[in-house]
């Protein structure tokens, strides 16, 4: 079981709603995925009616909807979008996305942290999409985010876990769930993330653009289940498996440590 804020999930596969060829195919694929948390871009929703081609099928699934702020380029725009989503969809959950760079869609760390602080204070359950930066993820955790969502590789690239080393550090030090988001292009990537110790993955493009989105969604479902079972069963030597010896070096070692130098300076000051 995975708990985020006040909600428990039995599925560790979260999914998106973009790029499907039809709402009907989207609904069928999401059913096959077994996902219980589905994200949707507010810019694609008809806020006037609150009931459109995206919302109608999603509500049939009985899942938790996670509106995202995709398209926002600043903290102010993201906060505005989150407030709109809360009113239109009656949810205080939000996936925080701020990416001003339209070419690579990389998240803006400064604006993301600023928006997260405001939204958490307003009572939102904030799940921020961010770079695989261990320092930033810790800061997002400290301001009250319910989970962190570091990228595996750029959105829609299907390149897999190109940030693996940094994801390891994030997972090791995080006290909130870690959801690997973006770049997961094959079921094997999702399995790898779960074996690594991630709490969940979010997949959209790889399912939506597959020759058979329904079969691919089911494949991802099985991969995530397998990855979680493998981790719980106890992989070989790994820093995430306390029953086995830790043979991996994950800590940095300074080539020019300042310890002795600073001690000498302190001694000189006291002379």
Swiss-Prot record:
The active site is at residue 95. Pathway: Cofactor biosynthesis; thiamine diphosphate biosynthesis. One of its GO terms (biological process) is thiamine diphosphate biosynthetic process. GO terms for cellular component: cytoplasm. Its EC number is 2.8.1.10. It is found in: Cytoplasm. Disulfide bonds: none annotated. Signal peptide: none annotated. Transmembrane segments: none annotated. Keywords: Cytoplasm, Schiff base, Thiamine biosynthesis, Transferase. One of its GO terms (molecular function) is thiazole synthase activity. 1-deoxy-D-xylulose 5-phosphate binds at residues 156, 182-183, 204-205. It catalyses: [ThiS sulfur-carrier protein]-C-terminal-Gly-aminoethanethioate + 2-iminoacetate + 1-deoxy-D-xylulose 5-phosphate = [ThiS sulfur-carrier protein]-C-terminal Gly-Gly + 2-[(2R,5Z)-2-carboxy-4-methylthiazol-5(2H)-ylidene]ethyl phosphate + 2 H2O + H(+). Belongs to the ThiG family. HAMAP family: ThiG. Homotetramer. Forms heterodimers with either ThiH or ThiS. Catalyzes the rearrangement of 1-deoxy-D-xylulose 5-phosphate (DXP) to produce the thiazole phosphate moiety of thiamine. Sulfur is provided by the thiocarboxylate moiety of the carrier protein ThiS. In vitro, sulfur can be provided by H(2)S. This is Thiazole synthase. It comes from Yersinia pseudotuberculosis serotype O:3 (strain YPIII).
């Amino acid at each position: 079981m995975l708990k985020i804020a006040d909600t428990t999930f039995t599925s560790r596969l979260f999914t998106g709603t973009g790029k499907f060829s039809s709402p009907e195919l989207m609904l069928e694929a999401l059913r096959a995925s077994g996902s219980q948390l589905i994200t949707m871009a507010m810019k694609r929703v008809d806020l006037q009616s609150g009931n459109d081609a995206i919302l109608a099928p999603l509500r049939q699934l009985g899942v938790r909807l996670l509106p995202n702020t995709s398209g926002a380029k600043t903290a102010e725009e993201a906060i505005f979008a989150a407030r709109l989503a809360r009113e239109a969809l009656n949810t205080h959950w939000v996936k925080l996305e701020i990416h001003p760079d339209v070419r690579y869609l990389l998240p803006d760390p400064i604006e993301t942290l600023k928006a997260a602080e405001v939204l958490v204070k307003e009572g939102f359950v904030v799940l921020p999409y961010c770079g695989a930066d261990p320092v930033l993820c810790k800061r997002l955790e400290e301001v009250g985010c319910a989970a962190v969502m570091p990228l595996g590789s750029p959105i829609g690239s299907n390149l897999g876990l190109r940030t693996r080393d940094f994801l390891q550090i994030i997972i090791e030090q995080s006290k909130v769930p870690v959801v690997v988001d973006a770049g997961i292009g094959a079921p094997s990537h999702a399995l790898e993330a779960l074996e690594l110790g991630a709490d969940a993955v979010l997949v959209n493009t790889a399912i939506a653009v597959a020759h058979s989105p329904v079969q691919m969604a089911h494949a991802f479902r099985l991969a995530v289940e397998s990855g979680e079972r493998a981790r719980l069963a106890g992989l070989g030597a790994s820093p995430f498996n306390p029953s086995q010896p830790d043979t991996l070096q994950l800590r940095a070692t300074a080539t020019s440590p300042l310890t002795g130098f600073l001690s000498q300076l302190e001694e000189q000051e006291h002379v």
